[in-house]
């Protein structure tokens, strides 16, 4: 039997043996699609590089080692509210934690959220608001089309529910900190369900942190429903470690005249594969999809995106930038689909990449599929090195070569940082990126919570 088959078989056997336990420690709404998801995973198997969608990241090999799972939901001995120090000072947020893949319910502070807003354990909220969760959970994350999503849906037992009622504006940003902490090599399967009803507005910052003395594998599925006239910002900041592998699938559906900003920033990692699928389902919807990756050593960052212009009069703006050093590898594949009836579409996709060494590798694959004739669509991708003329100019004016290189790299990614609509976060990212380029930011330094 091949290693790949062994990897699949161990989880097939595990689910078959532990399905009752998995369901017992979850909620009915999460259990409802579980059997179908498992069957979809069993049929598809782990993705390999032979599949076009996963050609730049061999997902299957990362599931071959043995990982521990907390299917019995044993409590983790950690008190995040006592030891966590936010990496973004001067930003007042409503702060919540997920420890491994369980929402931390103990010692919750007063969140200060407006009346009717829900932010809490997906498992608990599915028991308190079953009809709400059943209506949305799993409706965007199609397990028949993606094996990682199927795997996550089969094994996920908890996560986060964020619900903002009609016309409610959440002025204070919400911050969710994902913590990976264990004594053995460990796997987590996280789930996030986000619902903004008509006219609602909110901003969410998700921060990923991990301890560095064990190997982690994390799967994550996020579903976002942005209804008519809603406004939503989602920022993801990854500061984990070289021993962390993360597969994150983000699904977004937007209603008419909704405005969504997605910005995923990888400052430090091991292996990261992000899949983002956006459907513009209502006229006048606008998506701004941005990403930034800074990688060195043998780090690997792969972003695969698709934006589906399903109706007329929608706008999409996409901007991804990578800076790769040493033997790091980056990949970007972005599809923009304009359907036959989606006239008056405006779409712009840009991918710019900087390889600081000859050993760094960047793969880029921009794609446009246009089936309407009255549209404005463009895309562009470049892979290059630092501008030698600019370096010469700066050195001629007394700037040391190392400092000149740092300044050029910082200026290169600054465009992505400037899309952030939270000033405190934007200011902090400028500092964190500068420290990263100087080699002063090797991983999360916000607290001792993962130690």
Question: How would you describe each model-predicted region?
Answer:
Residues 2-221, 228-231:
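Short, low-to-moderate order helix/coil transition modules at the start of elongated helical scaffolds
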Residues 115-119, 128-392, 396-399, 413, ...:
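Conserved beta-strand/loop scaffold segments within soluble protein domains that form the structured core
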């Amino acid at each position: 039997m091949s290693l790949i088959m062994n990897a699949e078989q161990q989880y097939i056997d595990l689910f078959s043996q532990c399905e009752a336990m998995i369901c017992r420690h979850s909620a009915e709404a999460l259990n409802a699609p579980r059997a179908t998801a498992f069957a979809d995973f069993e049929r598809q198997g782990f993705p390999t590089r032979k599949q076009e969608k996963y050609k730049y990241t061999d997902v299957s090999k990362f599931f071959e080692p043995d990982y521990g799972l907390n299917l019995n939901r044993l409590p983790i001995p950690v008190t995040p509210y006592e030891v966590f120090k936010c990496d973004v000072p001067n930003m007042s947020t409503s702060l919540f934690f997920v420890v491994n893949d369980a929402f931390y319910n103990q010692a919750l502070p007063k969140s200060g959220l407006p009346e009717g807003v829900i932010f809490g354990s997906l498992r608990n909220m599915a028991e308190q608001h079953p009809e709400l969760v059943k209506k949305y959970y799993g409706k965007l994350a199609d397990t028949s089309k993606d094996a990682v999503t199927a795997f996550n849906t089969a094994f996920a037992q908890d996560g986060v529910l964020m619900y903002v009622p009609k016309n409610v504006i959440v002025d204070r940003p919400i911050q969710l900190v994902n913590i990976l902490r264990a004594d053995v090599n460990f796997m987590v399967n996280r789930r996030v369900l986000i619902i903004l009803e008509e006219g609602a507005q909110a901003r969410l910052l998700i921060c990923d942190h991990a301890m560095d003395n064990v190997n982690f594998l994390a799967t994550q599925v996020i579903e976002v429903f942005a209804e008519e006239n809603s406004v939503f910002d989602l920022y993801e900041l990854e500061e984990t470690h070289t021993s962390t592998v993360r597969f994150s699938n983000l699904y977004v559906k937007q209603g008419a005249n909704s405005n969504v900003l997605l910005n995923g920033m990888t400052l430090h990692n091991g292996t990261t594969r992000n899949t983002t699928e956006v459907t513009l389902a209502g006229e006048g919807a606008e998506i701004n999809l941005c990403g930034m990756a800074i990688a060195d050593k043998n780090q690997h960052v792969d972003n695969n995106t698709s934006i589906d212009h399903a109706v007329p009069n929608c706008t999409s703006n996409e901007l991804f930038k990578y800076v790769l050093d040493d033997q790091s590898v980056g990949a970007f594949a972005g599809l923009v689909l304009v359907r036959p009836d989606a006239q008056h579409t405006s779409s712009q996709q840009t991918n710019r990449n900087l390889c600081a060494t000859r050993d760094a590798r960047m793969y880029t694959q921009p794609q446009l599929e246009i089936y309407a004739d009255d549209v404005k669509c463009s895309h562009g991708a470049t892979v290059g090195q630092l501008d030698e003329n600019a370096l010469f100019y700066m050195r001629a004016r007394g700037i040391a070569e190392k400092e000149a290189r740092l300044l050029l790299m910082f200026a290169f990614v600054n465009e992505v940082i400037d899309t952030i609509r939270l000033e405190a976060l934007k200011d902090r990212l400028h500092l964190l990126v500068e420290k990263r380029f100087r080699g002063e930011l090797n991983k999360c330094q916000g607290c001792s919570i993962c130690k």
